């Protein structure tokens, strides 16, 4: 086992324990503060990742030039700032707090473990089977890894029912399996979304905060796309 993999596993376990503690014991106000801090870190990493784009944005903007807002690059690069600010500092915190406190802790943990297992499945299948690349956006992603993600995403609901965990009413049925597969799909698309911007800016990672992983965005890229989408699903009563 490589030292890099050991660091990756160790960091993941520490991060998981901290996350579980905060989810279970933080009250809503402190939880909101914590999620806001997470959002700020993600926003900063987003800006750092898009450094080349942001430099171009600066060049395209001149507050004293009347035609600054007619420059097509201004709108293109401003959208990078705007998306990051709105998504990480508004949409994400609202979604997380709603799912944790207005839906339930158990459901939030269910989502979290679907994403974790999906990520693990992608790594296990991709590393051991390999095969044809999934897309040029992320050369390390393989089709076998994607299949592994889908397969592993069903494990949480199977484990819940095998252990007959009390107070968790998530049955092993077609709808819940389909939901787990959908969450895995969104996780993978979220990963590819951020990989696209990293590749666009010749970046391997979004940061150096987490040993073995890179930045915080590298670790939770799928989850932070999943949560707002599930928030909308719950708001509209789809699931």
Regions found by a protein language model. Give the residues of each.
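Juxtamembrane interface at the ends
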Residues: 122, 128, 195-203
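Interfacial loop-to-transmembrane junctions
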Residues: 199-222
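Juxtamembrane boundary at the C-terminal end of a transmembrane helix
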Residues: 232-239
């Amino acid at each position: 086992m490589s030292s890099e993999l050991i660091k990756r596993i160790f960091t993941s376990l520490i991060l998981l324990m901290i996350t579980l503690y905060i989810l279970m014991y933080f009250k809503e106000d402190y939880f909101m503060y914590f999620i806001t801090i997470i959002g700020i870190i993600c926003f900063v990493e987003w800006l750092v990742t898009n450094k080349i784009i942001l430099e171009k944005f600066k060049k395209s903007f001149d507050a004293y030039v009347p035609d600054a807002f007619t420059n097509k690059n201004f709108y293109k690069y401003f959208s990078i700032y705007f998306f990051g600010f709105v998504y990480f500092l508004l949409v994400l915190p609202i979604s997380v707090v709603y799912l944790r406190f207005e839906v339930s802790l158990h459901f939030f943990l269910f989502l979290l473990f679907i994403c974790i297992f999906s990520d693990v499945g992608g790594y296990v299948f991709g590393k051991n089977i390999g095969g044809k690349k999934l897309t040029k956006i992320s050369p390390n992603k393989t089709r076998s890894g994607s299949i592994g993600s889908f397969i592993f995403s069903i494990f949480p609901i199977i484990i819940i029912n095998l252990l007959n965990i009390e107070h968790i009413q998530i049955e092993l049925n077609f709808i819940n399996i389909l939901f787990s597969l959908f969450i895995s799909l969104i996780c993978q698309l979220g990963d590819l979304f951020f990989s696209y911007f990293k590749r666009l800016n010749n970046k391997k990672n979004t940061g150096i905060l987490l040993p073995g992983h890179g930045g915080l965005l590298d670790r939770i890229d799928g989850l932070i796309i999943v949560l707002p989408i599930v928030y909308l699903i719950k708001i509209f009563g789809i699931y």
